[in-house]
Every structure is written in structure tokens, then in C-alpha cells.
């Protein structure tokens, strides 16, 4: 019976000593829209890309055209110029991290996902030859 009282007294002591109790005074916070002298860094708007019309991913029509033309994933990686990086990324995490930040890798992974969906759509034969 006395053990819960000991725990309650211990917790109350810890809460009081750590100032973890609720304080009714609200902190004086500045709103994010106001600028004061204490802000050392100015928030600048990001510079837009030089070519805003550039597409960074493949459309479904482009992927279908590549698939029907017989382009494999390796052929597409060579076309993007990342074939060597893809091979090196299999053994090096740093190369993989750098590769994953490029637009070419985004196109590569989009085409990889498209190819895997196309392979899932193929139905297996109804009978198997032994």
C-alpha cells in the first residue's frame, strides 16, 4: 500500500524540481511575419530554374513508346548517361545517395516502376511444360 505513495511523492518532487508543471504565463512569441533585429538570417525566395519548361519525369506515352521500341532498363540508363553510376551504386552507398538526387535517376526509377507494372500485367500460361 505504501509503494504507490512513494512513487507519487517521488514524481511530484521531480516535477517541481524540473519546472515541468504548467505555467499560466504565456511566452512572448513574435509572429513569423514580423521582422526584428534579432533575426540574423534573411529568408530569400528560392531562385527558379533557368528552364522552367523542362520536364523532369517521363510521361506515360513516352514510357509506352520506349517499352514498345524494346528499350530495356539498361538501354535507358545508357541513354540517360547514368549506366556506370547505377553499377557503382550497387556497391557504394555514397554513389547511390548522389545518384538518387539527380533528375536522371528520377526518370530511371519512373521507367523501372513502369516496366515492373508491365511485367505484372503479363499473365502466366495456363499450363506448364516439364
From Swiss-Prot:
Superkingdom to which the source organism belongs: Eukaryota
Gene3D superfamilies xref list: 1.10.10.2470
Region ranges (Disordered): 27-58
Main location, first listed in the record: secreted
Chain ranges for the short sequence motif RxLR-dEER as given in the UniProt record: 38-56
Classification via Pfam families: WYL_3
This protein's UniProt keywords: Host cytoplasm, Host nucleus, Secreted, Signal, Virulence
Induction (record text): Expression is induced during host plant infection.
Signal peptide stretch: 1-20
InterPro entries documented for this protein: PexRD2_WYL (IPR040691)
GO CC terms in record: extracellular region; host cell cytoplasm; host cell nucleus
Subcellular location: Secreted; Host nucleus; Host cytoplasm
Family note: Belongs to the RxLR effector family.
Function: Effector that enhances P.infestans colonization of Nicotiana benthamiana leaves.
UniProt comment concerning the protein's domains: The RxLR-dEER motif acts to carry the protein into the host cell cytoplasm through binding to cell surface phosphatidylinositol-3-phosphate.
Name of the protein in its database record: RxLR effector protein PITG_14783
Annotated organism of origin: Phytophthora infestans (strain T30-4) (Potato late blight agent)
